[in-house]
Amino acid sequence: MPPNPILTSQIQIKLDGTVIQHDLLTKLVSVIVDQHTYLPGMFALTFFDTDLRLLDRGPFDLTKRVTISGEKEDGTSFPLIDGEITALEPSFNEGMIAEFVVRGYDKSHRLFRETKNRAFVNIKDSDLASQFAGAAGLSAVVDATSIVYDNLIQDNQTDLNFLMQRAWRIGYECFVADGRLYFRKPPTSGASVSLTWGQDLLSFQPRMTLAEQVNEVMVQGWDPKNKVQVVGRTDSGSLYAQIRESKDGATWAGSFGRGKSTIVNQPVISQSEAENLAKARFTEITGTFVEAEGAAFRRPDIQAGKFVDLIGLGDRFSGKYLVTSATHVFTPEGLKTTFTVRGAHTGLVSDEIGSHAPLEHWPGAVIAIVTNTDDPQKWGRVKVKYPWLGETVESGWARLIGPGGGKKAGFLAIPEVGAEVLVVFEHGDINFPFVLGGLWNGIDEIPPMTDSAPPGKFPGVRTWCSIDGHRITVYDAPDSKIEITTASGIQVVLDDKNKKILLDCSADVEIKSGTNTKITATGNMKLEASGNIDIQASGQVNIKGAMINLN
């Protein structure tokens, strides 16, 4: 097969750092490079391989490094992807025609390989990005974030899923290009690629829509430290296309009446986080005012995450657009690049979490084990681990639910370390746990003096027992009494059935009063001792009665 001069002159392919041999290029059918700002970059090389030489003798093999660059008509070269081979796909077709497809991804695919369960303590989102980039062998380009989280849990997520979720929450981009992991605010300015309709811009289909456009975004949450509502709001975003349209989406939408998007299902820890979340969501909305697809000829410099400056589209649509994905296709006809403008987010993360909702992994209750009760704030909080999630994953501080809980009021029983408890999460977010209460099991038995009841009957005993064995027991009919019993057996019984109070103590009994003490009986009163009885007063002793008998 003769070499394809158009195709081979427009691309350069390196395998493990070495330009592939010319005889391999003569077998090349097509090259596809797919770039996204929110998905791993992908490449696919298709070769004729009727003699099966590439399949059996290489040089392409799994895990090898592939770099692909494209050239403009002036000879300027632009890197398109630096990736690794993850799949080999031979195709044995009719007529004894065989093709060999080499497929791979940029190094961000390493962050998709394994789901992990772990907790991060006192960490910022930008710290996570730097840490994950290093683990994947990538350099990091990170815009610093300011909020420090006491505890963040990666719950059965891949590193990139988790990082993309964090990026979505604060309105950041998260993608890999040129061997770098980018974790940054979407750019609002920068160098752009100029394209002219009728020349190198082959086609462009924009769509201007007021769907979802609002004038304000408000985030409402709760600050338990100060016991106040948290409200973050904004009326501006930064992802409008920089075109000559006279009004932005919010202004146009205001013609229908002022619109507001209120977010109440995403827990926030502070006023600043609420404001950041509001800005992120408003920015996301502004990016959907103008969406578009376009195509250009021989422009490898069109890259995801960069700007294109479109010329010749009239007064309204000429201007700068931020590219969110670009697909470069090399065929015998030459290099064609299609690109999209899709606002802040498209692809994997937005499919998973929707436009306005967080990831709600845990809408129900889960089992946990208490690991720490030494709450530095003295709120009665505890930390727990989730045995089904991993032995090393510990939560942040979880507040307890107590009957009648309020200011210096309510029933508080902090569970001990090692106790099994039932936990729920605020709006399903695993980083905001609440402990509903403790559980009994095959090891942790129910308290003594507690019974069950046959069908149709109600249990006759209710009890509360401390860790050391002190207990309060309430008996309904027929016994009808309340017992307060210490671990050593000292007991006070309020007997409703027999209309009496019993104080049972094998040691001393002492009654003290700061002022007067009075004991009154409508019937008889009896004082009896096996030993002596002493009556002593610093003042006068008066004994009165209808008759006084002294024996």
Question: Model regions: which residues?
Answer:
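Juxtamembrane "anchor/assembly" segments of surface/extracellular structural proteins
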Residues: M1-T63, Y105-H109, T196-G198, Q205, ...
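Surface-exposed, non-catalytic interaction/assembly patches
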Residues: V19-L24, F112-A119, N161-R169, A177-R244, ...
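Intrinsic-disorder/coil detector with helix-boundary
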Residues: L310, G514-N551
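Short, Lys/Arg- and Gly-enriched loop/turn segments at beta-strand edges
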Residues: E73-E84, D315-T324, G428-G438
